[in-house]
């Protein structure tokens, strides 16, 4: 399934520092992979798209990783209603995962 994680950063510098683990999928539960990362231009929040076996796995992973630097809400994507095209001008994940 696909899962959205909406992050509202309470401490953006700390959240971005800790979030490197999320971007690299370090310590992610089995079957859980980050696919897309969309931070706001003011660094106050971000939306991420995950592929996972469960919403609970993503919720626990982002909560444990970001800690008190972010308030996170996760939900399953409704695949019947959702759509996607690759946004032009965004770098591929391999460019930021190192």
Q: For each of these PLM feature ranges, what is it?
A:
Residues 1-45, 53-57, 61, 77-98:
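Short S/T/G/P-rich N-terminal loop/turn motif that feeds into the first structured element of a domain
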Residues 27-28, 65-73:
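A common structural junction motif
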């Amino acid at each position: 399934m696909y899962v959205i994680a909406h992050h509202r950063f309470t401490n953006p510098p700390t959240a971005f520092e800790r979030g490197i683990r999320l971007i690299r999928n370090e310590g992610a539960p089995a079957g859980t992979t980050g696919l897309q990362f969309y931070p706001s231009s003011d660094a106050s929040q971000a939306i991420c798209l995950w592929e996972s076996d469960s919403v609970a796995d993503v919720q626990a992973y982002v909560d444990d990783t970001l800690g008190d630097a972010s308030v996170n809400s996760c939900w399953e994507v409704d695949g019947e209603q959702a759509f996607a095209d690759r946004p032009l001008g965004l770098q591929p994940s391999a460019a930021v995962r190192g």
